[in-house]
Design a protein with these regions (language model features):
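Conserved alpha/beta-hydrolase "acid-adjacent" motif
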Residues: 144-150
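Short beta-strand/loop motif that positions the catalytic acidic residue
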Residues: 131, 137-139, 143
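Catalytic active-site module of serine/aspartate enzymes centered on a nucleophile-bearing elbow/loop
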Residues: 152-155, 161-196
Length: 196
């Protein structure tokens, strides 16, 4: 994800300082759909800053982000659909989860820092052909932010040998957080090769 973008940028800028590159759920540039969602998030946070509601706006923006990190299938398995009859603002089960994630996020992230981080993702551009070191690429077939086609395009455009692994996963973009064992099984042999 973000670390993958940093790794790609580092490999492109400093080719002599890197021997191997492991990229999880990242591409040479942002996907248009992800950029659109992040732009909405930045507008929400900006509106909050202008109206003395920055923390609530940041929480809402994070909730929106969570919908892009996870799959609709996972949410349908975990939460009941719909809201109560009494109040149009009554939360759904999924909404309560998103609210909790937003509250946790705003405890560790300032609105200004979020705006800078979000914009940096949408400014990310790397000339993948300039990266010649061996690269391991790992992605999820269900990822909405870095769809499989983007991982395949990165695989095809990197200038060195690559190994692409696209996994079926319920967790979408958050695969790397939720499937640590599977990530380790792919990363360990690749990293061990480099240590020899």
């Amino acid at each position: 994800s973000y670390g993958g973008m940093v790794g790609l940028a580092f490999a492109a800028l400093f080719p002599g300082r890197i021997d191997r590159l492991a990229i999880i759920s990242a591409a040479a540039e942002p996907h248009a759909a992800g950029t659109a969602v992040r732009e909405l998030q930045r507008r929400i946070v900006s509106l909050g800053l202008r109206n003395n509601a920055a923390n609530e706006a940041l929480s809402i923006a994070r909730g929106l982000a969570m919908l892009t990190y996870r799959t609709s299938e996972e949410l349908a398995r975990r939460f009941a659909p719909g809201i109560g009859l009494e109040d149009p603002l009554s939360p759904s089960e999924a909404g309560e989860y998103l609210r909790a994630r937003g509250e946790a996020f705003r405890a560790v992230m300032s609105p200004e820092r979020f705006l800078s981080l979000s914009a940096s993702i949408d400014r990310h551009r790397v000339d993948a052909q300039s990266i010649a070191c061996p690269a391991l690429l790992i992605g999820a077939n269900s990822d909405q932010l870095v769809p499989p086609a983007q991982m395949q395009a990165l695989d095809a455009s990197l200038g060195g040998p690559t190994s692409l692994h696209l996994r079926d996963c319920l967790y979408g973009h958050d695969m790397f957080l939720k499937e640590a064992k599977a990530m380790g099984e792919l990363l360990q042999p690749f990293l061990a090769e480099g240590a020899q």
